[in-house]
Every structure is written in structure tokens, then in C-alpha cells.
Amino acid sequence: MEVKDILKTVDHTLLATTATWPEIQTILDDAMAYETASACIPASYVKKAAEYVSGKLAICTVIGFPNGYSTTAAKVFECQDAIKNGADEIDMVINLTDVKNGDFDTVEEEIRQIKAACQDHILKVIVETCQLTKEELIELCGVVTRSGADFIKTSTGFSTAGATFEDVEVMAKYVGEGVKIKAAGGISSLEDAEKFIALGASRLGTSRIIKIVKNQKVEEGTY
């Protein structure tokens, strides 16, 4: 698989709590230069970022992040506010307390409400796979499919672990037609990125791939 094809799947990500505007600018510049799928940044930077890229790059942001236990009304407002400010894609975190209580209907209804708030914008649902049993993950594949969301996403990158090959395999087997998979968290090599894609992921959330590509270009004397 060519590097440029891997880069097209990447949501180039900076969600650090201490991220500065110059750091966000670098993320945006690199994402545009390497033609990634989007740049994923904190909601507080969305308006400024959207103005900065001026339609040359999709802007993704996160809501209910990273713990997911804010109310549905709060998440809906976050979504509407982000879109008003120029976000093209929304990555939401589900409420894991509902999952652990076995209340999957509430999880589904929340996703439906946020999808309605997204209108025609892309919605990715973060299920935080490292906190789930296999049975819970399988159930959530059905929930996300029925909800009308566009993607199921493995991880926030802020919990105990990120994406695993095994979890993406489960998602690919049990998610419904029309729902795509985003693997995120801990993707640190082009080889891993390619394997996640081969297993069924069509988006990768990572901050490292562009750095790897840059280093390769330096080593090859082409950058």
C-alpha cells in the first residue's frame, strides 16, 4: 500500500489539553500538505481553524470528550456549536455508565439525537474498546448501526489503551453495512496503519504517521 493512500485515511490529531495555537497550526499545515482525511482538534479551536484552512481541509472535533458522561443535552449543544463554528466531522464519546448498566437503548437514543444535530455532517461514535468486554463491543456494533451514525471508533486515546487489531476485527465482523470503522490511539507505525486498514478500518486517528513520513523523507534526502 502506498504511503499516500494511508495518509488519505488519517485524521491528523492533536487533542492534548495543553495544545497551543502554533501547535494546532502545525497540525493543520501538515494535514493540508500531506492531504489527510481531516485534522482532529479541540472544539475551542474549531472556529479559528476553519477560518485558517478556508475549506482546504476537513475539520474534525470531539464532544463529550474524553469520558462521555456529560448529559445528552450537553453533547447535542456541543455538536451544534461545533458545526456552527465550522466543524465538518464530529467524534462523540458514548456514556460507558449506560453500557455497564446494560442500558443500550439509552446509548442508541443519545447517538440518534446527536446524529440529528449533525445533520449531514459525519458522526463517529467512540466506544472506548479497552473498557469493553467482547460481548459489549458486539452489542455496540449493532447500536451504532441502528443509530444512523457514519463510523464506529475504537478509542479516545485518553484511556488505558488504544486500538487493537482484535477489536477492529470484531467491529468489521459485526458492524452493519454502511457503517465505517475508525481505529485510533497508539497507531505508531506505517505497518500497523496498513494492517488496521487491511482489517477493515477506513479511518485512522493518529498524531504520529506524518512524523514518520517526514522522517523517512529526511533519511531519503527527499525532504
From Swiss-Prot:
Keywords in alphabetical order: Cytoplasm, Lyase, Schiff base
Catalysed conversion reaction: 2-deoxy-D-ribose 5-phosphate = D-glyceraldehyde 3-phosphate + acetaldehyde
Signal sequence extent: none
Main location: cytoplasm
SMART domains reported in the protein's UniProt record: DeoC
Keyword hit for Cytoplasm: yes
Disulfide cross-links: none
Pathway listed: Carbohydrate degradation; 2-deoxy-D-ribose 1-phosphate degradation; D-glyceraldehyde 3-phosphate and acetaldehyde from 2-deoxy-alpha-D-ribose 1-phosphate: step 2/2
Its EC number(s): 4.1.2.4
Top-level division of the source organism's lineage: Bacteria
GO molecular function, one term: deoxyribose-phosphate aldolase activity
Active site: 91, 153, 182
Subcellular compartments: Cytoplasm
InterPro entries, alphabetized: Aldolase_TIM, DeoC, DeoC/FbaB/LacD_aldolase, DeoC_typeI
Family per record: Belongs to the DeoC/FbaB aldolase family. DeoC type 1 subfamily.
Record PANTHER family: DEOXYRIBOSE-PHOSPHATE ALDOLASE
Name of protein: Deoxyribose-phosphate aldolase
Source organism (scientific name): Streptococcus agalactiae serotype V (strain ATCC BAA-611 / 2603 V/R)
Gene that encodes the chain: deoC
